[in-house]
């Protein structure tokens, strides 16, 4: 399988990635294992999931259980921010939620780090700089290699990138690798 550079991250990802939304919802552990084994045999090394996939955590749990010792050979991307409960309290981009959500994802994925951790959708209740600060903290702790975003409209994406650039200029060093 052809590998391509993932932006300026230094990561080399397979030309095809595997979306893991069906794991834990339509596919049980055995079927998930078959899909992942086939994907890895075909040369796929990029696996994309989210904490809400597979009925709130099921996809990450099955992916973590299946990868095992192959974790070092793959690029794991997961998202946070969509509601993990019926009331919608376990959601968003607040610092408090981001820090707790990553711990839950790390546990389900059975890994010490996430290669790409990204906000699933905009959180109108949280300033983007708060979310970026939390992601920066996770990068400094080694829990997240790169931060990104998903489903942000162009103007919000531009604002997020400007906030990240401004903070980086102020700190005189780059601590978080933001790819959104």
Name each model feature, range by range:
Residues 1-74:
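N-terminal binding-site loop/beta-alpha segment at the start of enzyme catalytic domains
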Residues 7-23, 77-90, 113-118:
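N-terminal small/glycine-rich loop or linker at the start of catalytic domains
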Residues 13-17, 45-46, 73-79, 113-116, ...:
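Structural preference for beta-strand elements that scaffold enzyme active sites
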Residues 20-30, 84-99, 120-126:
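Active-site mouth loops of central-metabolism enzymes
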Residues 21-23, 50-52, 79-83, 119-122, ...:
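Active-site beta-loop-alpha junctions enriched in small/polar residues
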Residues 27-39, 93-110, 133, 157-161:
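Short, acidic/polar
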Residues 106-126:
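Active-site groove signature of glycoside hydrolases
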Residues 126-180:
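Beta/alpha (TIM)-barrel catalytic core signal, keyed to glycine-rich beta->alpha loops juxtaposed to Asp/Glu
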